[in-house]
């Protein structure tokens, strides 16, 4: 499947003000890149939030009482039902900005990385153990570099 054939229905929710955010077109490109060769169509929500909402969701769903860069909530259809609904990503603008500065990375490249990373989680990838982490990071690096950005795991 050619990634240009992937149809994306992206519901973008912006629940934060005062940050430089990527455009809907950029977000859609990054989602299409992450879904390359996996789905012909996909529906997902990306919600960009503040520190408080990120921390509340991270505490509720992961037991970690701090904000985080991206949370992924995959949609699980009942058995036998095929739907293009992928799930939801919640991205904290303040954390992404701070991480980009701390890691000396261009903000736009870090946004791309967070969207690709979150989409891979929606597809079932994880980084709980070393072998899973290695597989996921390798795929992330390939996808991010295909977008023209540098390896997100390379020290700056």
Curated annotation (Swiss-Prot):
Its cofactor is Zn(2+). Coiled coil: none annotated. GO terms for biological process: rRNA processing. GO terms for cellular component: cytoplasm. Keywords: Cytoplasm, Endonuclease, Hydrolase, Metal-binding, Nuclease, Ribosome biogenesis, rRNA processing, Zinc. It is an enzyme of class 3 (hydrolase). Its EC number is 3.1.-.-. It comes from the Bacteria. Binds 1 zinc ion. InterPro entries: MetalPrtase_cat_dom_sf_prd (IPR023091), YbeY (IPR002036), YbeY_CS (IPR020549). Single strand-specific metallo-endoribonuclease involved in late-stage 70S ribosome quality control and in maturation of the 3' terminus of the 16S rRNA. Belongs to the endoribonuclease YbeY family. This is Endoribonuclease YbeY. It comes from Shewanella halifaxensis (strain HAW-EB4). The lineage of its organism: Bacteria, Pseudomonadati, Pseudomonadota, Gammaproteobacteria, Alteromonadales.
């Amino acid at each position: 499947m050619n990634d240009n054939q992937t149809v994306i229905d992206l519901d973008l929710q912006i629940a934060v003000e005062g940050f430089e955010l990527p455009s809907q077109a950029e977000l859609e490109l990054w989602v299409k890149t992450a879904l390359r060769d996996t789905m012909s169509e996909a529906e997902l929500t990306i919600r960009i939030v503040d520190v408080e909402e990120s921390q509340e969701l991270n505490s509720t769903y992961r037991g970690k009482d701090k904000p985080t860069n991206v949370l992924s909530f995959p949609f699980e259809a009942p058995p036998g039902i095929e739907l293009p609904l992928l799930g939801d990503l919640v991205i904290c603008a303040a954390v992404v900005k701070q991480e980009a500065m701390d890691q000396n990375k261009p903000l736009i490249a870090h946004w791309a990385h967070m969207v690709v990373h979150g989409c891979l989680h929606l597809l079932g990838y994880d980084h709980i153990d070393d072998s899973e982490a290695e597989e996921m990071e390798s795929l992330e690096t390939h996808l991010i570099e295909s977008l023209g950005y540098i390896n997100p795991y390379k020290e700056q």
